[in-house]
């Protein structure tokens, strides 16, 4: 069965009741994957072990799943780096009864892969996509944590956080906890509090990256790119941030070409350009031609295709220059 972020509570209930016997977690958000595993270990009083899928054979998996430990506790077994193809012997084992609880962990699972389909279609199995938090999800995390401490947050502060806190789920939660601790003696958290606390490295984001790239400020672009990669943000998300930026430029340049005022054209964008970036965005529009904008969009779209075809040897900077 497929579970989404809003259904995680229900998933935990089904696992605790023994109705879900194995779990597949896939995607680039390692922090969220670890958070789910940690919750299960803590709340269901499990021990844990870990093994790479390629080091596993069917006999050893059968032994791991059916071996009681000395203390009589269930064990959460992390099976890392599972691929897209389902081994028929694995299917047979997971269809039977066993003692321990396996969690299979994959990176980027193919939507048509037999492993993902198997976990989605069987009632006793579950699958959760663990992708980096989008702005709506980040806002829910922020407001949820603040509600527990009876705090509120200004509109400017939450807009800044939604725009800048991109990446690993655990990293986002850590930064919000730091902010709450810093502002322990105030009821309302403001933008000034945020700017004083949130790490400059954490606030690397796609908007800044795109601004640097379109200004041809490659030194800062590479620095920002390195920070994003340290946050476990993969190349596809980075490329799509650049594509969104150039689509905004394309929309504005097209409207200006058709006689619309530049300021009005920029204000028409949805979601809007963050106010800290408006001056830079305006300068880029003045310096960029519509033809060059379209050419860059095509390069970025091809870069995404190239990455998906051969991620191991992909170099983003070389692909889009």
Swiss-Prot record:
Keywords: DNA replication, DNA-directed DNA polymerase, Nucleotidyltransferase, Transferase
InterPro entries in alphabetical order: DNA_pol3_clamp-load_cplx_C, DNA_polIII_delta, P-loop_NTPase
Task of the protein: Part of the beta sliding clamp loading complex, which hydrolyzes ATP to load the beta clamp onto primed DNA to form the DNA replication pre-initiation complex. DNA polymerase III is a complex, multichain enzyme responsible for most of the replicative synthesis in bacteria. This DNA polymerase also exhibits 3'-5' exonuclease activity. The delta subunit is the wrench that will open the beta subunit dimer.
EC category name: transferase
NCBIfam families: holA (TIGR01128), PRK06585.1-1 (NF005134)
One GO term describing the cellular component: DNA polymerase III complex
Reactions catalysed, as given in the entry: DNA(n) + a 2'-deoxyribonucleoside 5'-triphosphate = DNA(n+1) + diphosphate
Enzyme Commission number: 2.7.7.7
Protein family (similarity comment): Belongs to the DNA polymerase HolA subunit family.
UniProt GO BP: DNA-templated DNA replication
UniProt protein name: Probable DNA polymerase III subunit delta
Gene Ontology terms for molecular function: DNA binding; DNA-directed DNA polymerase activity
Gene3D superfamilies, alphabetized: 1.10.8.60, 1.20.272.10
Subunit structure: Component of the DNA clamp loading complex consisting of tau(3):delta(1):delta'(1). The DNA polymerase III holoenzyme complex contains at least 10 different subunits organized into 3 functionally essential subassemblies: the Pol III core, the beta sliding clamp processivity factor and the clamp-loading complex. The Pol III core (subunits alpha, epsilon and theta) contains the polymerase and the 3'-5' exonuclease proofreading activities. The polymerase is tethered to the template via the dimeric beta sliding clamp processivity factor.
Species per Swiss-Prot/TrEMBL record: Rickettsia prowazekii (strain Madrid E)
């Amino acid at each position: 069965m497929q579970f989404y972020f809003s259904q995680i509570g229900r998933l935990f209930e089904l696992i605790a009741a023994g109705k879900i016997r194995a779990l597949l977690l896939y995607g680039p958000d390692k922090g969220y994957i670890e958070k789910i595993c940690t919750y299960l270990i803590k709340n269901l009083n499990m021990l844990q072990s870990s093994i790479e899928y390629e080091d596993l054979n069917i006999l050893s998996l059968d032994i791991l799943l059916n071996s009681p430990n000395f203390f009589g506790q269930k064990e959460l077994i992390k099976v890392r780096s599972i691929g897209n193809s389902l081994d028929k012997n694995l299917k047979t084992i997971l269809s039977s009864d066993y003692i321990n609880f396996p969690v299979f962990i994959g990176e980027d699972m193919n939507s048509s892969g037999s492993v993902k389909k198997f976990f989605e279609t069987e009632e006793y199995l579950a699958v959760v996509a663990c992708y980096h938090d989008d702005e709506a999800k980040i806002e829910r995390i922020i407001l949820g944590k603040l509600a527990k401490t009876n705090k509120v947050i200004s509109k400017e502060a939450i807009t800044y956080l939604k725009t800048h806190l991109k990446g690993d789920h655990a990293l986002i939660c850590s930064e919000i906890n730091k902010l709450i601790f810093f502002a322990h003696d105030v009821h309302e958290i403001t933008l000034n509090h945020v700017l004083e606390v949130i790490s400059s490295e954490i606030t690397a984001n796609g908007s800044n990256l795109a601004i640097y790239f379109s200004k041809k400020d490659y030194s800062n672009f590479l620095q920002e790119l390195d920070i994003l990669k340290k946050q476990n943000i993969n190349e596809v998300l980075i490329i799509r941030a650049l594509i969104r930026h150039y689509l905004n430029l394309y929309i504005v340049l097209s409207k200006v070409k058709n006689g619309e005022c530049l300021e009005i054209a920029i204000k028409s964008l949805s979601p809007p350009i963050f106010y800290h970036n408006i001056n830079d965005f305006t300068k880029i529009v003045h310096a960029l031609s519509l033809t060059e904008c379209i050419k860059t969009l095509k390069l970025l779209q091809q870069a995404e295709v190239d990455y998906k075809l051969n991620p191991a040897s992909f170099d983003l900077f070389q692909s889009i220059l």
